[in-house]
A protein has these predicted regions:
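Hydrophobic alpha-helical segments of polytopic membrane proteins
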Residues: 61, 83-90, 164-177, 184-235
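Hydrophobic, glycine- and aromatic-enriched re-entrant/interface helices and adjoining loop segments
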Residues: 103, 107-109, 212-316, 341-343
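Alpha-helical transmembrane segments of multi-pass membrane proteins, especially transporters
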Residues: 159, 163, 167, 211, ...
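Membrane-proximal intracellular helices of multi-pass ion channels
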Residues: 226-227, 314, 318-321, 330-343, ...
Length: 437
């Protein structure tokens, strides 16, 4: 079986790390099987039994083509993408704040030429790529002498970290600030990924702590304003009234009417998700035998992990979790192989974003954190998420192909040195024998 898989990759159809491709294919397979089972409500709305399934497979095929094409593009050209992509993404985010249409009670979507998509998905990738470019220019290698010999260390260029922090901070503020009004969870995750990238990129912790302190002060003032201002005033500011309602409920300032329709709607998803998990009885009810899918809102997207647990039990839950853990591990190995900073920062940022989104989705499904609306990458139903996740996979696979080339070159160079040394030893031995004669 393993040999057949290697033979498939030798067909030159796909390029890059085999492990990453296997994770990609397995996630797609889980998506197809689960969407077929979980999309009963979509099927009822469309009145066509196969429509949700066909659309999902169609998006996965398009995503696969994008991943294949990008995996064959040299990663050095990716630096050019955010030059155009980031300003475009910011403009789309501003547009969605002004003239967007609501989907699932959240105005996060825009429609262009009959295609609906979320600009925040594009903005995530563009910002990570831009930050990778900035941080890569900050790094430099220095040779230092130690007792064990010469050691190469990576440090920030003199004074460069302040410039990098300013640029990255400004870009992050603009993009996350534009995303937050309609999708706070995405803005928070993206901000967290950028902070981790800056930490890896040798930006001084003291400088980052100063920035975080300022943000915490702004956050405290913002929350205070939400609590003090009346609802009638906040209704003029998009979802501010909703945030006020949730904060007051969380800290116990607002009495919750459990008989109200709003309370029932807010808790229905969480309760039905718990019912789905409890119905699994550890071993699962079997693929396609879910009962909760007909009653759980957004079972095919936000709460698809609950359906996976219900049908496949603990085993299915662990397998999906391990796939994303393995993705993060493989991405880390690819970054370690890179001899240039930009591709290393790029794969780390994209990998962290995908895995963090998956962890948030799964945490919501099992009731660890409040509902966020985050989908499960490559598995949940949705075209924008699948296409852009595949785009990110393509970028990572291109870097993995570059990293493998670096390792091969180092291996060939080392082999040549060994061969040269063997030749010299043989020559010395010949001269030695001649001298002895």
């Amino acid at each position: 079986m393993g040999r057949k898989i290697k033979d498939f990759f030798k067909l030159n159809i796909v390029k890059g790390d085999i492990g990453l491709w296997m994770i990609y294919f397995l996630l797609c397979m889980v998506s197809i099987v689960t969407i077929y089972s979980a999309s009963s409500q979509l099927t009822f709305k469309s009145e066509r039994h196969w429509e949700p399934m066909v659309s999902q497979v169609g998006f996965l095929v398009v995503g696969f083509i994008i991943a294949v094409v990008l995996s064959k593009v040299p990663c050095k050209y990716f630096k050019l993408i955010p030059v155009v992509g980031l300003p475009l993404a910011f403009c789309l985010l501003v547009y969605v704040l002004v003239a967007s249409k609501g989907v699932n009670d959240a105005s996060r979507w825009i429609s262009l030429f009959g295609i609906s998509f979320q600009p925040s998905e594009i903005a995530k990738t563009m910002l990570i790529m831009a930050v990778a470019v900035v941080l890569s220019k900050l790094q430099k290698e220095e040779k230092i002498k130690t007792k064990k010999g010469t050691k190469i260390v990576v440090r920030a260029t003199k004074g460069g970290y302040k410039k990098a922090f300013t640029i990255v901070g400004l870009l992050t503020f603009l993009i996350c600030g534009a995303i937050a009004p309609e999708n706070f969870s995405t803005a928070f995750m993206l901000f967290t990924v950028i902070v981790i990238m800056m930490f890896i990129g040798n930006v001084p912790v003291k400088l980052m702590m100063k920035g975080l302190t300022v943000l915490l002060v702004v956050r405290a003032l913002f929350v205070t304003a939400l609590l003090v201002l009346p609802v009638s005033t906040l209704q003029n500011f998009r979802r501010a009234a909703t945030w006020k309602h949730r904060i007051e409920q969380k800290i116990g300032l607002e009495d919750v009417d459990k008989d109200s329709q709003k309370y029932k709607d807010d808790t229905r998803q969480v309760n039905m998700s718990k019912v789905a998990i409890a119905s699994s009885n550890i071993t699962g009810v079997g693929v396609g035998n879910s009962v909760t899918r007909d009653f759980l809102p957004h079972a095919e997207s936000d709460f698809i992990y609950s359906i996976i647990i219900e049908e496949t039990g603990v085993a299915g839950a662990v397998v999906v979790l391990l796939l994303f853990v393995m993705l993060l591990i493989r991405v880390g190995r690819v970054a370690q192989k890179c001899d240039r900073f930009f591709p290393a920062f790029l794969v780390v940022g994209l990998g962290l974003m995908m895995v963090m989104q998956a962890m948030v989705n799964m945490s919501v499904a099992v009731g660890l954190i409040p509902v966020t609306g985050q989908t499960l990458p490559l598995i949940s139903h949705g075209g924008t998420s699948i296409i852009l996740t595949s785009f990110n996979f393509g970028l990572i696979l291109s870097v993995s192909r570059y990293a493998e080339g670096v390792v091969d070159k180092k291996g060939k160079a080392a082999k040549k040195i060994i061969e040269d040394e063997d030749t010299l030893l043989e020559t010395d031995e010949i001269y030695s024998n001649v001298g002895m004669a």
